[in-house]
């Protein structure tokens, strides 16, 4: 009887380990895809309310080579 309980617990732990590993890998894939989309996107202008020198310098538009290196409405 003890052997069956131990075997059941080990089986459950193994299944949970597999599920957690699969979810972590899926999250990694989603992070890579989202990161790629974020790198590819470029906003046309920065809203006037968020328009500071720091925001202009570090905006997606400024950092990406294929975007214009201006700050839009600043």
Swiss-Prot record:
Site (Important residue for binding Kv1.3/KCNA3): 46, 50, 59-60, 62, 66
A molecular function GO annotation: toxin activity
Keyword Plastid: no
Marked site positions, Key residue for binding both Kv1.2/KCNA2 and Kv1.3/KCNA3 (occludes the channel pore like a cork in a bottle): 61
Function: Inhibits voltage-gated potassium channels (Kv) with higher potency for Kv1.1/KCNA1 and Kv1.3/KCNA3.
Leader peptide range in chain numbering: 1-22
Positions of the propeptide segment: 23-39
Domain of life (superkingdom): Eukaryota
Record keywords: Cleavage on pair of basic residues, Disulfide bond, Ion channel impairing toxin, Nematocyst, Neurotoxin, Potassium channel impairing toxin, Secreted, Signal, Toxin, Voltage-gated potassium channel impairing toxin
Boundaries of every ShKT domain copy: 42-74
Localization annotation: Secreted; Nematocyst
Protein name: Kappa-stichotoxin-Sgt4a
Family membership: Belongs to the sea anemone type 1 potassium channel toxin family. Type 1a subfamily.
S-S bonds: 42-74, 51-67, 56-71
Organism encoding this protein: Stichodactyla gigantea
């Amino acid at each position: 009887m003890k052997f069956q309980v131990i075997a059941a617990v080990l089986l459950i732990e193994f299944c949970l380990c597999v599920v957690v590993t699969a979810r972590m890998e899926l999250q990694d894939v989603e992070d890579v895809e989202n990161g790629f989309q974020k790198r590819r996107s470029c906003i046309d202008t920065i809203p006037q309310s968020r328009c500071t020198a720091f925001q202009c310098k570090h905006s997606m538009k400024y950092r990406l080579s294929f975007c214009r290196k201006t700050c839009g409405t600043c």
